[in-house]
Amino acid sequence: MERTENLKKGEKGALLNIFAYVILAVVKLVIGILYHSEALRADGLNNGTDIVASVAVLIGLRISQRPADSDHPYGHYRAETISSLVASFIMMAVGIEVLIGGGKAIAGGTTETPNLIAAWTALGSAVFMYGIYLYNKRLAASIKSSALMAAAKDSRSDAFVSAGAFIGVFSSQLKLPWVDPVTAFIIGIIICKTAWDIFKDASHSLTDGFHLKDLEPYKQTVGRIENVHRLKDVKARYLGSTVHIEMVITVDPKLTVEEGHGVADEVEDKIKHEHDVTHVHVHVEPDDIK
């Protein structure tokens, strides 16, 4: 129940992102086109992909709230990971389009100097998006949402991209018009890099990948439990923002079945309490070490 409430809180951050990105995308695209800034136009297209990514996060958070059923005995938590994967494809497509546009402008030797209005628009956007990043970062940390944290990091990247657009446009005022399309090209690279990072993390999670170093805290917790002789095996996987763990422990072979079951319950309770894990399955075996 607590996890569902946290997912609902996460929707606020996703909705805030959508609202902010819609406004910024429209403003940047209009000003970028009217005042001849390739960098600001690229930044606006970047925000357009962010709208899609934020909508995907919102949809994923809502689907993830559905309870487990006969077809999904572990719940629907992976919906937010799937939505992130879809968003990464769209972001990559737009990033490539920006790269092509910036590359053509560089090759064409553009001499058109953007208006300073484009520079101030980019600077204002950078400050605004960094504020959005700080808000969503705090919210994501409080509700332990990896999807919202990823969205927050994307907002931080957007702030840096907008700052880069400001530098590009401002440099054009110093009789360096080539800096603007070069900045647009760099923005395209940043969009593609962000898309790749999201794709890599989402695909790793969906294929049940789990970094070995992240298992250490769980091993340390089990190691402190008195009646556990050995942690024979431990595996974990992500289902959305939740963690599911399976482990095999050994206990004194003289323990009764009921006592062994009690040790397993103690392990489950400590793992869930100390690490906010959703599901823990513990298999108990008699210790055969003499």
UniProtKB/Swiss-Prot annotation:
| Membrane spanning residue stretches | 14-34, 82-102, 115-135, 158-174, 176-196
Protein topology in the membrane: Multi-pass membrane protein
Q: What is its main location?
A: membrane
The lineage's top-level taxon is Bacteria
| Signal peptide annotation | none
Q: Does the keyword Nucleotide-binding apply?
A: no
Compartment annotation: Cell membrane
> Keywords, A to Z?
Cell membrane, Membrane, Transmembrane, Transmembrane helix, Transport
Q: Does the keyword tRNA-binding apply?
A: no
Q: Can you provide one Gene Ontology molecular function annotated for this UniProt record? A: monoatomic cation transmembrane transporter activity
Q: What GO CC terms are in its UniProt record?
A: membrane; plasma membrane
Tell me the InterPro entries matching this sequence: Cation_efflux, Cation_efflux_CTD, Cation_efflux_CTD_sf, Cation_efflux_TMD_sf, CDF_Transporter
Q: Which family does it belong to?
A: Belongs to the cation diffusion facilitator (CDF) transporter (TC 2.A.4) family.
Q: What is this protein called?
A: Uncharacterized transporter YdbO
